[in-house]
């Protein structure tokens, strides 16, 4: 029995390595060259009115918890609900972030470039800390709060409660260590970035398959 437990622990550690590698490779592929979202002044009243009309349009989206949520048809301003969500969104749509969950280190800020280190730090909505700064999220002008991670019991109710408190849509995208590709495809659907989601999905799937193949040949 001890051997079985050890093998399971070894497999779990390997999956964690693969998941971390996938995110790292996605960061490298992205380059994070896009700047975070800024609300630039409109050059003409007509353009402003057109943009406002577009912002008011909505559609429905079914998140990974099975909740049907009314979301903006065009999403330009995102607040991540936690640290994993920040990492995933930095690879998927860095230009749309208006907050981050935790302060960046000097090395992270240098690597990412842009003004990410200057974005408001809003904490995490769920988990052990659950220290989301709701006032800062509201002040950021975020259109939506996006969480990522494992789908757990009671999550639907927690997400609904958070949505009521914030007054903006709150959705969750499941991220499994063995299938980050599916998360990127789901994000692509949500953000209207299907091509980008497919690109990152394919990249993660290829990286996962190759890494698992290599690690399977290493004696336990």
What are these regions (language model features)?
Residues 28-47:
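Bacterial lipoprotein signal-peptidase II cleavage site
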Residues 79-81, 98-101, 144-148, 170-174, ...:
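Structural recognition of the beta-strand scaffold that forms the well-ordered cores
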Residues 85-140, 144-151:
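A short, structured surface patch at a secondary-structure boundary
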Residues 18-28:
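Bacterial N-terminal signal peptides
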Residues 41-60, 66:
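Post-signal peptide N-terminal segment of mature Sec-exported envelope proteins
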Residues 60, 68, 157-220:
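Extracytoplasmic substrate-binding proteins
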């Amino acid at each position: 029995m001890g051997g079985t437990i050890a093998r399971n622990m070894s497999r779990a550690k390997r999956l964690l390595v693969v998941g971390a590698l996938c995110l790292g490779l996605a960061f490298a592929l992205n380059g994070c060259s896009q700047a975070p979202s800024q609300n630039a002044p409109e050059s003409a009243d007509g353009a402003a009115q057109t943009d406002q009309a577009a912002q008011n349009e909505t559609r429905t989206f079914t998140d990974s918890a099975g909740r049907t949520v009314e979301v903006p048809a065009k999403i330009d301003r995102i607040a991540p609900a936690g640290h994993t969500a920040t990492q995933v969104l930095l690879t998927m749509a860095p230009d749309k972030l208006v907050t981050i969950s935790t302060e960046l280190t000097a090395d992270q800020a240098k690597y990412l470039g842009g003004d990410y280190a200057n974005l408001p730090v809003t904490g995490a909505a769920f988990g052990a800390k659950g220290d989301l700064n709701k006032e800062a999220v509201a002040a950021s002008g975020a259109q939506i709060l996006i969480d990522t991670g494992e789908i757990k019991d009671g999550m639907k109710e927690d997400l609904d409660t958070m949505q009521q408190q914030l007054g903006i849509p709150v959705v969750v995208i499941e991220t499994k260590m063995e299938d980050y590709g599916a998360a990127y495809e789901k994000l692509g659907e949500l953000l209207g970035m299907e091509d980008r989601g497919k690109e990152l999905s394919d990249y993660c799937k290829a990286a996962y398959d190759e890494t698992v193949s290599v690690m399977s040949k290493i004696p336990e």
